[in-house]
Each structure stands twice: as C-alpha cells, then as structure tokens.
UniProtKB/Swiss-Prot annotation:
The keyword Membrane does not apply. The keyword Metal-binding does not apply. It catalyses: 5-hydroxymethyl-dUMP in DNA + ATP = 5-phosphomethyl-dUMP in DNA + ADP + H(+). Disulfide bonds: none annotated. Residues 266-275 have a biased composition (Basic and acidic residues). Keywords: Host-virus interaction, Inhibition of host innate immune response by virus, Restriction-modification system evasion by virus, Viral immunoevasion. Belongs to the thymidylate kinase family. 5-hmdU DNA kinase subfamily. It comes from Salmonella phage ViI. InterPro entries: HMUD2, P-loop_NTPase. One of its GO terms (biological process) is symbiont-mediated suppression of host innate immune response. This is 5-hmdU DNA kinase 2. Phosphorylates 5-hydroxymethyluracil (5hmdU) into 5-phosphomethyl-2'-deoxyuridine (5- PmdU) on DNA as a step in the pathway leading to thymidine hypermodifications in the viral genome. The phosphate is added internally to the DNA polymer. As a final result of the pathway of hypermodification, 5-aminoethoxy-2'-deoxymethyluridine (5-NeOmdU) substitutes for about 40% of the thymidines in the viral DNA. These modifications probably prevent degradation of viral genome by the host restriction-modification antiviral defense system.
Length: 304
C-alpha cells in the first residue's frame, strides 16, 4: 500500500527542518540505507530508506552555501541535478511501484499541478497521501525569518510564491472532492482537512486509506510533519516500537533548528570536504578520506 507525503511551501518556512526532525528520531531506533540513482554517467544520492517501515525520505544532508549550516534538502537537489521534473517523478514512481511510502519536500518546482492530488492519484500507484503546505501570514515575518536563516536580506522571488501556494491549496482541496474523496474532518475553517473514501471505514486514519491536506503556519511545532508521516504509516510504526509520544518528547529535547552563529545540530551528518593539498614544487598526490556512510495536525498543535 504505497503512500506519498508531500511538503511544499514558501522558502524558509522550515519544511526540511521538520522532515529531518522525524528522520533523526527514527535514526535513534532504526538504521537507514542510503539510496542513489544514476543518470548518464553520474551517480547521486536519492534518499534514506527505512526498510522496516517501507519508508523512503527522498533527499540528502547538505551544507547551505548561504549560511554554512547543515540541513536536509529533498526534491530541489534532484531537480537541480537532473534539470528535469520528469526524471525526478519517474524516480519517485519507481519506488512507489514497489510499495514504499515516500516523503518528498521542496520548492519552487513543486508549485505545479503534477504535485497536486489529481495528477498524483492518476499517475502514481498510491492509496493515500498527505499534502502539507507552509506559508507566511505577511512579508514582515518572511523577511525576518530569511535574515535569521541565511544572514542575508530576503529577495522578492520567494515571497512572490507565498500567495501562489495558498491558491494552490484551494485547488488541491477541490481536486480531492472531484476524485471522490469525502471530507471526514474540516478544521480551522478549511485549513486542515481529513478525507476518507466512501468504501472505507469513516474513522480517521483507521483504514490506511485516509488522506490529509493542510495549510500550516511557518511557526508550527517541529513535530507536525512527522505526525502526518506517522499517521500515514499507521500500525507499522507501533509494530516497530515507535510511539508518537516519544517523538514529541524528542522534538523537545533534540530540536533540529539551526541558527547562523548558533546551533548546527546536523553538522555531523555532512562529511567534511578534504582540504586541498598545498602547492609545492614537487606535486603530491592528495588522498581523499573515505566517506562515512484521527486527530488533525492543527488540532494537535494545541496538545500542550
């Protein structure tokens, strides 16, 4: 029963941070396998696979060329490396066809009808999805966030897409209804909607065929993405002794938030680049060290 969790929204809303928060918690219990893909003569990282959960996080750890901080990047890296949205979607489809649940995050190329419910249900072998959007309420908060994240002033291109994501969220909700999904729960004036299929049990997240669409604020708790993934996986997590209450506690004690000149909790996940050999009259051979290898979301935000 393949599923897909898609996280997209305005730049700097902490999408990747919330994804990697769940990854790092899983790594305290399970050991992932690193996946790669090859296009032409280039082999690149594809993601991390947790076989016990049949779960793949598309992406890789990286270092920001703006802030110098370690982070998680997902579809943006594949789009940039291949220069093709079609190749990226084919890679995703290949793993979904094998029954894996995939977590894909990114922007701006995911602001597309091909990352909305209608296209995904018609082109991917999936039973359900969670589609989470993140946005800012105003430009002031966007500018402040970008300065704190990169140490530089925000540009206009990222902000211009903020309104576009809000409009796309409404389109996605309309597509779910057109596809025959019924609204099970509608919270916060349509900002968090749970859907079920007519032929399934109407209890939220009990059948494994429930989907969710949510528009979340940029300052939502660190656990909101992990919570959505957890519920899509259902009993698989509990069968592996992965309890949601433990994840909430991990978010409190081990936040993956980072700051220029401050915390950089993922630095150890990114291998240091070998230093270039100094130039001398006699050229030395530089050796590179080997590399180490149902409850709604917005409702849960009030749990504290």
């Amino acid at each position: 029963m393949a599923k897909i969790i898609v996280i997209k929204g305005t730049s700097g809303t902490g999408k990747g941070t919330r994804v990697v928060q769940f990854i790092e918690w899983l790594r305290t219990k399970l050991k992932p396998t690193e996946l790669s893909y090859t296009v032409g003569d280039k082999t690149r990282p594809f993601g991390l696979k947790f076989e016990e959960l049949k779960l793949i996080f598309v992406g890789q750890y990286t270092v920001s060329n703006k802030s110098g901080l370690a982070s998680w990047t997902s579809m943006d890296a594949i789009h940039a490396a291949t220069g093709s949205g079609d190749i990226a979607r084919d890679l995703v489809k290949g793993w979904l066809a094998q029954g894996y649940t995939l977590v894909c995050e990114g922007e701006p190329l995911m602001l597309s009808d091909k990352w909305r419910p209608e296209w995904m249900f018609k082109n991917y072998p999936i039973d359900s999805l969670a589609l989470l959007y993140f946005a800012y309420p105003d430009r002031y908060q966007y500018d402040a966030r970008i300065r704190g994240r990169s140490g530089k002033e925000a540009g206009d291109s990222g902000w211009s897409r903020n309104e576009s994501y809000s409009k796309e969220f409404e389109k996605s909700k309309a597509e779910m209804l057109a596809l025959g999904w019924n609204v099970a729960v509608d919270d916060y004036s349509g900002q968090d909607v749970l859907y079920h299929q007519t032929a399934t049990n109407t209890q939220e997240f009990k059948t494994g065929n429930d989907s969710e669409l949510a528009m979340l604020p940029f300052d939502a708790p660190l656990w909101v993405v992990g919570n959505a993934i957890y519920h899509q996986l259902g009993t698989v997590c509990r069968a592996n002794n992965l309890m949601s209450k433990d994840f909430y506690g991990y978010c409190e004690t081990n936040p993956m938030t980072r700051e220029v000149g401050g915390q950089d909790p993922l630095a150890h996940r990114v291998p240091e680049k070998p230093q270039k050999a100094s130039k001398t009259k006699n050229k030395a051979v530089a050796k590179e060290e080997p590399k180490t290898s149902s409850v709604s979301l917005l409702g849960l935000m009030r749990k504290a």
